[in-house]
């Protein structure tokens, strides 16, 4: 892939009842939404069936939208251990889907995503939705989980951009006798 080709990233906000996702093409500073949405699951279904649905639907999305990379939100461990375990399972189903399709997978905490997108690591859900609408030039605010998926993809693209700009400079400094 040439350096002038956009990188397509799918961002995943895993959940055992609703999994949000967003696909963004990034080229330099430019980012454009490809598609976004949610995978809504019946909470009355047994967890293994919901995990299968997350996996199958993400594989289908990856096949259709052809992202180059995947970014997934890390599990936030709350006081409710059962919820954290279910979230971890949903996250695992998403990661396996990406790995099965051969995608490199990056992981970010919710705080990293919020800080990268809003500039504040404790931003509220509605702030994230509005920021996604503004930054990605959307007609309306995306659903919360879809906005999170878009934000995760955007965070990853921003991290890639930052590494591409700073890493060559660091290497160049080392080659000139600088220190790491």
From Swiss-Prot:
Similarity section: Belongs to the RuvC family.
Annotated localization: Cytoplasm
Gene that this sequence comes from: ruvC
Binding residue positions for Mg(2+) 2: 73
Organism: Magnetococcus marinus (strain ATCC BAA-1437 / JCM 17883 / MC-1)
Catalytic residues identified in the record: 13, 73, 145
UniProt keyword Ion transport, yes or no: no
Species lineage: Bacteria, Pseudomonadati, Pseudomonadota, Alphaproteobacteria, Magnetococcales
Name recorded for this polypeptide: Crossover junction endodeoxyribonuclease RuvC
Residues noted as binding Mg(2+) 1 in the record, renumbered to the chain: 13, 145
Transmembrane segments: none
Single annotated GO MF: crossover junction DNA endonuclease activity
Gene Ontology cellular component terms for the protein in this record: cytoplasm; Holliday junction resolvase complex
Role played: The RuvA-RuvB-RuvC complex processes Holliday junction (HJ) DNA during genetic recombination and DNA repair. Endonuclease that resolves HJ intermediates. Cleaves cruciform DNA by making single-stranded nicks across the HJ at symmetrical positions within the homologous arms, yielding a 5'-phosphate and a 3'-hydroxyl group; requires a central core of homology in the junction. The consensus cleavage sequence is 5'-(A/T)TT(C/G)-3'. Cleavage occurs on the 3'-side of the TT dinucleotide at the point of strand exchange.
Assembly notes: Homodimer which binds Holliday junction (HJ) DNA. The HJ becomes 2-fold symmetrical on binding to RuvC with unstacked arms; it has a different conformation from HJ DNA in complex with RuvA. In the full resolvosome a probable DNA-RuvA(4)-RuvB(12)-RuvC(2) complex forms which resolves the HJ.
Presence of the UniProt keyword Secreted in the record: no
UniProt keyword list: Cytoplasm, DNA damage, DNA recombination, DNA repair, DNA-binding, Endonuclease, Hydrolase, Magnesium, Metal-binding, Nuclease
Gene Ontology biological process terms in this record: DNA recombination; DNA repair
PANTHER family: CROSSOVER JUNCTION ENDODEOXYRIBONUCLEASE RUVC
